[in-house]
Amino acid sequence: MNNETSGKETASAPLCSPKLPVEKVQRIAKNDPEYMDTSDDAFVATAFATEFFVQVLTHESLHRQQQQQQQQVPPLPDELTLSYDDISAAIVHSSDGHLQFLNDVIPTTKNLRLLVEENRVRYTTSVMPPNEVYSAYVVNDTAPKPNIVEIDLDNDEDDDEDVTDQE
């Protein structure tokens, strides 16, 4: 038959399979509280769609990174590495906004020092002497722990209360 099929495809032998494991896609879907019974073909389609989504996001991020590196004087490296900032920048600057829905999931990072200087974040550290640290861990679990960084993301500038004062 010249390696041609006679028009019949067997359900057990797909033409191609996704690179992502379908079983993991099923497991993730079944963890959703709104999960409904779904066919195996739908899970395969979801795996293919996820692969395509990851490819688009990676391509956009690499393209954005290459544009930024071309503006710099040093030559481009042979190997490119994507960072979180590259991906979040690609999401923010997506050409037609097709990645904007990811803004809440992958937000841009902000420099803590700049936020403190702008008075948008209160940043305090407290260091305890070693003998108090030991007693705090052994005797009292509710005592303040050493080197605790308190960040108050409250945008109210007129509110001068500290997070520890509210307890």
From Swiss-Prot:
Provide this UniProt record's keywords sorted from A to Z.
Nucleus, Phosphoprotein, Transcription, Transcription regulation
- Subunit (UniProt): Component of the ISW2 complex, which at least consists of ISW2, ITC1, DLS1 and DPB4.
What does the UniProt record say this protein does? Answer: Functions as a component of the ISW2 complex, which acts in remodeling the chromatin by catalyzing an ATP-dependent alteration in the structure of nucleosomal DNA. The ISW2 complex is involved in coordinating transcriptional repression and in inheritance of telomeric silencing. It is involved in repression of MAT a-specific genes, INO1, and early meiotic genes during mitotic growth dependent upon transcription factor UME6 and in a parallel pathway to the RPD3-SIN3 histone deacetylase complex.
In the record, what lineage is assigned to the organism producing the protein? Answer: Eukaryota, Fungi, Dikarya, Ascomycota, Saccharomycotina
What Gene Ontology terms for biological process does this UniProt record contain? chromatin remodeling; DNA-templated DNA replication; regulation of DNA double-strand break processing; regulation of DNA-templated transcription; subtelomeric heterochromatin formation
Q: Which GO terms describe its molecular function?
A: protein heterodimerization activity
InterPro entries listed in its UniProt record: Histone-fold, Transcr_DNA_Rep_Reg
In its miscellaneous comment, the UniProt entry states:
Present with 3390 molecules/cell in log phase SD medium.
Name used for this protein in its record: Protein DLS1
> Is Ribosomal protein set as a keyword in this record?
no
| Transcription is among the record's keywords | yes
Q: Where in the cell is it found?
A: Nucleus
Q: Which GO terms describe its cellular component?
A: CHRAC; chromosome, telomeric region; nucleus
- What main location does UniProt list? nucleus
Residues modified to Phosphoserine: 17
